[in-house]
């Protein structure tokens, strides 16, 4: 080996020109000397607001990395209690670990920029001040180099700080980057440009914006049509991002001792950027004009891009192209001059492009905007903006926020639409209008004659089922959720009248009916009353005092039989339903041998029972009981309420109607209003807070609103998520309050939002709109938003304040909910003047159907 090395050296010396002289000093290293690692030179990071560079450095040592790796293996694992405690603190946003908190705070501030108007000037200015993650000015002002081919590796590198103002290459609008063209220097590369291109992009993970559900569905359908696997396409797809953080970490490590100061060449751009307003492309999608410029300029790429970059060599050197400083998007009012941008695609030597691009219409279809904290959709409608100066810490919190996918919004909207369609298809549509609908017809009554009867039904202007059908489906209705005193007294009065009734048998034996003595004709019929009538049976040797009952007698019923010790009581209201009689056709008992013309029928929604004919019961849309003979043998409230049977037939217990009614709607129009609200306001807020927080606020606000409505409007069937929607509106106020310090005109935004909510409350004073659910849902949603809706913090003191705030508002909400439960179940109240909060009687009959002293039919 030594001889071969000596031969090669001698051959090289023979080829060396006589005029070339190389003096290479020999390095002498002793045996005991430990080789020292030379730390990399610190690179100067330039900020906008600083005239002098700030030095930041990294020191890397292989030995220290090995030691740190070994130490990490012996770290003690945290206990389960600490893990649960830390996870709970992270979920509420009060953890000591600043990563999760800062991520949420950055997202919150970004969301604020689209909802509540312009920010204060100092806030926007502070957002543009240097922070720990801003990209260095050198990397933004120095053009990137062209890649040096392998055949030219031996040539010298040239530092070219004046390489500006040359031709540009075009970047696709998907990436949105604008980078100046590198001057073409044959066989050379700019060292300053090379390190500038590596400044921030190599160390920051290129996180791409999450795709929408529609875009993923479109890609999956395309993969199925082409016969390819969706996973294969996902793995083959390169990692990209649709936006770039507003700053990068300014710590660069270079491999050479010299460093250039380019702040002089960036002075004009710094002055121009300081005068610009805060309008970031992070919050917006690319405009149509920009997309068209991209397509029109792709034809001239070959003349501007220079030589193509070899893909394998480019990956080896980890060359990444920097961003144009600021990556601002010009407002539509003042169109910017056209720029020729650098194409960020990695191109092979033969000129082929990597991957394919979706067409312009598809790009526009799937373009998604990120929701800035404090602004959002409502902020766009009210022209809300940030201040001009925002603290860099607050700005960092906004940038770290990611939009959540509105899974809960899509799920609840799908459920609402599906249930509404099924309800309309099964129960039909009630008469449409705002008044009462009357139907008159001639119907066979219980006395065997035809009579003109009238059926009154409440109209439904929402184009949906009737109130009785909505109660069957699970509407909020107090008599089905507790034992209502008025309904219970009505049933007791009916039982008292029935206890003193008897069977009225016509003289011609053509029919019989259970009535009182006043309703039985003394000339055409006989009122078989015990013990005056000779057909009275005995009970323990004593004549029975109550009876008789048409088609039911203890002596003729065999199942259940009236035998000792299970004899039927003297009180006929406690008699059971007889399911089997004696087979004899003639018993010589007038109330048994007659033809019965009326049986119990449950009519209305208040538990009213009548013994009438089947024809009349069907006309009144009641529930006819063919098997019973007395109203005391049936439970009308069980028929009216439906759903699961009561545990105790005399005590309604369907408390689950408080949240079941949130999924129902009064009609098609009602469902459309909810869908519009949820796909705009609810979807926008869920992007900010996530499905779990929004679902908690949505459901708990709706339950609280329904509970208050059940207290003050007990006899009115209510459906729909009115309380939930006003609880979501309360989230807008909480978000505005938390973003107060960064808004330019917070009082103006508050006034606009307050006017909208007051208008909705005033709209609730009209008939068929429950204002009690609106008010209670708004108050509960306000408390829950302070507890469950995290926000940006402005220091350590603000974090401690939030911890106290979470506890206080949770306690207040629990106290409010407990108070409503006590008023509903323990101490029911009857408020006479409360009806003015839900309906103002402009005329005598305007609020008749909403009277809290409901008429019990």
UniProtKB/Swiss-Prot annotation:
Protein topology in the membrane: Multi-pass membrane protein
Region (Disordered): 283-307
GO molecular function per UniProt: growth factor binding
GO CC annotations, alphabetized: endoplasmic reticulum membrane; Golgi membrane
Lumenal face of the membrane: 435-661, 715-716, 770-774, 827-857
Pfam families on file: iRhom1-2_N, Rhomboid
Disulphide bonds in the chain: none
Source species, domain of life: Eukaryota
TM helices/strands, residue ranges: 414-434, 662-682, 694-714, 717-737, 749-769, 775-795, 806-826
Skewed-composition ranges (Basic and acidic residues): 290-300
GO BP term, pick one: negative regulation of protein secretion
Compartments, as annotated in UniProt: Endoplasmic reticulum membrane; Golgi apparatus membrane
InterPro entries associated with the record: Inactive_Rhomboid (IPR051512), iRhom1_2_N (IPR022241), Peptidase_S54_rhomboid_dom (IPR022764), Rhomboid-like_sf (IPR035952)
Entry keyword set: Endoplasmic reticulum, Glycoprotein, Golgi apparatus, Growth factor binding, Membrane, Protein transport, Transmembrane, Transmembrane helix, Transport
Residue numbers on the Cytoplasmic membrane side: 1-413, 683-693, 738-748, 796-805
Gene3D superfamilies, A to Z: Rhomboid-like (1.20.1540.10)
Positions in coiled-coil regions: none
Glycosylation sites: 585
PANTHER family: INACTIVE RHOMBOID PROTEIN (PTHR45965), INACTIVE RHOMBOID PROTEIN 1 (PTHR45965:SF4)
Functional note: Regulates ADAM17 protease, a sheddase of the epidermal growth factor (EGF) receptor ligands and TNF, thereby plays a role in sleep, cell survival, proliferation, migration and inflammation. Does not exhibit any protease activity on its own.
Family in the record: Belongs to the peptidase S54 family.
Name the record gives this protein: Inactive rhomboid protein 1
Species this chain originates from: Danio rerio (Zebrafish)
